[in-house]
C-alpha cells in the first residue's frame, strides 16, 4: 500500500536510466494545483455528508500519504519517463469519474492511487514505449497486486472509455491553462507535444484490453 511517509522515504526506484534528472513539465504543476483544490473541496464536502461514497473504495488507503500531490506527480514523471500528455489524459479520466460517479469523492485517502493508476493507463494508450504495472507499482508505492486491481476497477468505472479525442484533449489543455493564469502558476502549456495522431477519435483499445 502507499505509505504515509514523506516523499524522501518512498523506496528509490532502480531501473533503466532511473536516476536521470529532467525538468518538471509545467503541466504537472498546474494539475497538482487543480487536484489539491479538488481534494480540499471534497474533504469539506465529506465532512458535511459524513461519507466519501463507495465507488472509489478500491483506491482508498489506510491513511493519507504525507507526500504532496506535486511531489508524487514529479516522482511518477521522473522514473517512468511518460510523456507530459499522459498527465493531462489522466486528469481527463479523473474528471470523467467525478461526473459519472458524483457521489464518490476524490479525497486525500485515494487521490495518489487514482493518479498513478490513471497516468499508467494513459501511458499505455499514448506512449509507444512504457513500463509495466510492476514498475509503476514500485514508483507509486503500492503493491503490484493492488495496482492490477485498481487498473481493472478504473476501467470498469469508466466503462472502458479511455480514448480521448484531440478536441477533448485540447479543451482540457485550455482549461488547465486558464487555471494557470488565474493562479499565476506558470506561463504556458507549450511543453505538451501535439497529440493529434495518438489521441485521434479512431484510437482503440483493441491491443490492450480485449
From Swiss-Prot:
One of its GO terms (molecular function) is protein kinase binding. It holds the Pfam family Cyclin. InterPro entries: Cyclin-like_sf (IPR036915), Cyclin_P/U (IPR012389), Cyclin_PHO80-like (IPR013922). GO terms for biological process: cell division. Keywords: Cell cycle, Cell division, Cyclin. It comes from the Eukaryota. The keyword Secreted does not apply. Expressed in roots and flowers. Expressed in the shoot apex, leaf primordia and young leaves. Interacts with CDKA-1. Belongs to the cyclin family. Cyclin U/P subfamily. This is Cyclin-U1-1. It comes from Arabidopsis thaliana. The lineage of its organism: Eukaryota, Viridiplantae, Streptophyta, Embryophyta, Tracheophyta.
